Curated annotation (Swiss-Prot):
One of its GO terms (cellular component) is cytoplasm. It catalyses: L-arginine + H2O = L-citrulline + NH4(+). Its EC number is 3.5.3.6. It is an enzyme of class 3 (hydrolase). It comes from Dichelobacter nodosus (strain VCS1703A). PANTHER family: ARGININE DEIMINASE. This is Arginine deiminase. InterPro entries: Arg_deiminase. It holds the Pfam family ADI.
Amino acid sequence: MSQYPLGVNSEVGKLRTVMVCQPGLAHERLTPDNCDELLFDDVLWVEQAQRDHQDFVEKMRARDIEVLEMHESLAETVKNPEALKWILDRKITPNLVGLPIMNELRSWFEGLDARQQADFLIGGVSVLDITPDKFSADVISLVRATQGDLGFVFPPLPNTQFTRDTTNWIYGGVTLNPMYWPARQQETLLAAAIYKFHPRFAGKVKVWWGDPDKDYGNATLEGGDVFPVGKGLVLVGMGERSSIQAITQLAQVLFAEKAAERIIVAAMPKTRSAMHLDTIFTFCDRDLINYFPKMVDQIKPYSIRPDESKPNGLDIREERKSFVDVVQEALGLKELRKVATGGNSYAADREQWDDANNVFALEPGVVVSYDRNLLTNKLLKAAGVEIVSIRSSELGRGRGGGRCMTCPIARDAAY
């Protein structure tokens, strides 16, 4: 399969290359006691989740889409000794794992094969992995005393399943996102390593903003809030996970690099059900959106444009029209067709919670959607959308659908 230029130029143009992350060891570490802390609503039947995820992957590959899997890409990355050292220098530190275990942990880790290293980097290293055949008795005793019998030396990252959020490609470059919740902050380090060292990406990636070595404080950004829709326009949700501190820094960089001309900020209610803009609003075609009116109608839109006469070079203005109307006008569309979440108020709330509005476009008018959202899918089909259905019973337990589970790396323009 030929390699396409890196860059995402729309929400619905033909998808060429995408990164996903199959459920694995990290999900086997989920328990009823820790799943809430790790941002999952329940534990998964991991084997079924893997089968369902592989079905999702095969359906994309059947449409000539190149699908990269994160465990595989990370394993290929850490075969480079420089890459492994770069990661371990940042993962196995006095502050993260503690001085007493550092040397033995690193020695053990460096002795693993590349796929095992990738599995543990994503899946975490648990107290149960600190065994007498690998570690001294004193280290084992100390780890159990400090972490308990089911604790972690470094924690699992089950939310890598949702590759959308950690990094996002905006036209010709990518952001390495400082995540909102501590449970997700280590994900960015692994994605950054892939882009920095993997043979596919090394020396070819333009980083717009973000650095896993820096503390960004309140400046948090997640890819579920970021939409590079085309025509120099970027939509960015500002709710639970992405902050104005990050959004305005991103705007400065994109304008300075001439990568964007306007940012439309969607100020949203800060709720778990609307954690990202893409949980309530997604594109299905060039002129068709799928949205949850109950939340989208509450969005307060702002526009950010470059203006050197303004403080920090940014002209920020509140829009007087609705978010959807502002997006329609910005794209120069005579009409932006809308499909609302299906059913009465009870059904719509249920389907939105189950990611009915988190569809993922493979090309104009073709989207991936969970099978359980029958009412919304029926309305999308009536609007002329082809539905590529995937099973949701296990994959959806982390609150994310097709858009959440994908990080497009190469996508055509749509306008």
